[in-house]
Curated annotation (Swiss-Prot):
Keywords: Activator, DNA-binding, Nodulation, Plasmid, Repressor, Transcription, Transcription regulation. Belongs to the LysR transcriptional regulatory family. Residues 23-42 bind DNA. Transmembrane segments: none annotated. This is Nodulation protein D. It comes from Rhizobium leguminosarum. Residues 6-63 form the HTH lysR-type domain. It comes from the Bacteria. The keyword Transcription regulation applies. NodD regulates the expression of the nodABCFE genes which encode other nodulation proteins. NodD is also a negative regulator of its own expression. Binds flavonoids as inducers. Pfam families: HTH_1 (PF00126), LysR_substrate (PF03466).
Amino acid sequence: MRFKGLDLNLLVALDRLMTERKLTAAARAINLSQPAMSAAISRWRDYFRDDLFIIQRRELNPTPAAEPLAPVVREALLHIQLSVIAWDPINPAEFDRRFRIILSDFMALVFFEKIIVRLAREAPGVSFKLLPLDDDPEELLRRGDVDFLILPDLFMSGAHRKARLFEERLVCVGCSTNEQLQGKLFLEQYMSMGHVAAKFGRGLKPSVEQWLLLQQGLKRRIELVVPGFNLIPPLLSGTNRIATIPLRLVKHYEQTIPLRIIEHPLPLLSFTEAVQWPALHNSDPGNIWMREIMIQEASRHWNPRPKVVRLKRPRSFHSRSS
């Protein structure tokens, strides 16, 4: 098919080049030879009268003229798939797809493990690429470079649809042998004790409790920063440090690590874990099927949900804590 001199089959090649950023990998992904992929690039360059890609550090980086094309090309291909190709109902036993999902280490451990176990039985052809929290997940969603984002919903963009998974609350926790935690924990003591805190991404984005403390103008004595929640419980063991972490994470570790939950001196609010997907994938049958699986598993394991006070969305996802 051609449109104003452009072979629309080249859309697939351009989409893959934008995703892979490597000529050989892109060619292999769509079963083209490297010379054929090079020819496709040449034809795109002639069409747009622009280099489109510049080689930097062995990668094909889009030029300013090419960068806006990525979401447009991806959306065009998805519309063709959804409008022209007849989709059969998803048969889990025969479904073959890899989903790319951004989520925290905490959610991978306490929630997504259940998805993996279930689909290993029901849909063995489904695989996953679990990705750490990115500094700009909204941009990845906009381009359709990831299939799902699992986060507290207060950190999510309003530009894409989302679905609630479950409510979570934060608790203060320390080692069971910590003598400073024998009685009630007052705010002054909480602020003066050494804390272990999690931060995410290369930009060290704050976690939920850090954002809440920042909103109240409170500054803890953070003695140890780790790249995720799951490292915190083991690093509290045998120390006098404390941390503020999700309750489900404490429950996961309480049989193997001597932990003590203390009533928090602050009225820390509960928050909602949610799943979000690109607007480009709203009608994608595979994406719909996968999101329904996640919602089912969250409902099956964590109902009824407690009544909570909802946090407002922070002004910036990139807020930093001191």
